Amino acid sequence: VIITDSGQDFAEVSRKLTGLLGRQKALPDWLYDGVILGIQEGTDVVDAKIKKAKEAGVPVVGVWCQDWSGCRRTGFGYQVMWNWEWDQELYPGLDKKIAEWKEEGVRFLGYINPFIAIEKDLYAYASEHGYCVQDREGKDYLVTITTFPAAMVDFTNPEAYEWYKGLIKENMIGLGMGGWMADFGEYLPIDAVLYSGEDPAIIHNQWPAI
């Protein structure tokens, strides 16, 4: 489906576009009070860089740590382990540090996407319960991202949807995160088989909003 429209100025076009696609909620006030630093490689590294930035007079209101769930080193470089649980080896004491940082006015932000690392327990659980997008042979559809394969949660399956939602509530919000980056909504393969039976070529562009 292709939809076209026009407006007298950018504001009108923006109103029409967000009326169609949905309007983003207002951002929290604290976001405008300083910078969010993108940091990775563990609790001690993050803590040290927050302190160094503050000593230099930088108003830090947040840290975005995409590797909170762990990392993997590949030929592509340092990459996130897509296992949406707190990696306590890389980030020891993170739960307590998040609370401490927040008291200092620094929020902790994380990262998540629709994939799950096939090496970890979350994938084993999802696969066993039929929560993954399938290929035409009825197997979990493994998509190669940069240098490694990963499975994708099938959000058209109500149980899978609730399970993934639970991961966010328990492992991210429950940990004390002030927000996160939601990535890779564009990767649904158009030759996949979905729980709902819908055509992935049709639902592809709706995937990020599900």
Task: Locate predicted features.
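Catalytic-domain carbohydrate-binding cleft regions of carbohydrate-active enzymes
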Residues: 1-210
